[in-house]
Amino acid sequence: VSGSVLLQWIPALFAFFFGFSMTAHIMALLFVVICLVLLYVFYHPATAVSSTAPTNDYRQLLRRNYAFLLLAGGTFVLFCILLSTHTILPKDDGLHVGQCTYGDLQMHLGIITSIANQQTFPPYYSISPWDKLCYPFLCDSISSSIYLFGASLRYAYMLPMYFAFFQV
């Protein structure tokens, strides 16, 4: 979860100064790297004298949770299949989406492309160009970041969902 928060907020903080651009994202990356280096240098956890936890016995952990891992893995595969077959499929007669994404998808795709293309922060609403966006758009800013770095709109929309699935 903290990774998603970092992907949303750190580029957003630098976007106030540099716009929602590659420069803001590179500055955000440098900020996170500096924080990690400082944490590595100055953080010294107290070592425990004795530990009752098993030491790296992953086989036993897998055996005890085999049914759960099998069900979770199968559910993730089903989620991936459904997401990839319901999200912006190019066909001969246009773009197709699944019924479950038919209503909300257009708004989110508009927000994703607006944030990446406008490179202003906070972004303007693409339907009413002189109005600031009054919607919780940071959830779409991760997809905007991926889209800004050259991914297709389809994959920029889907990739954060795969990681969000594991956070639930």
Language-model region placement:
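Membrane-embedded, hydrophobic transmembrane alpha-helices
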Residues: V1-L62
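Membrane-entry segments of alpha-helical transmembrane domains in multi-pass membrane proteins
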Residues: V1-S2, F18-L29, Y66, S126-D131, ...
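Internal/C-terminal transmembrane anchor helices
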Residues: L61-L82
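Active-site lumenal/periplasmic loops and adjacent helix-entry segments of GT-C-fold
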Residues: F76-V168
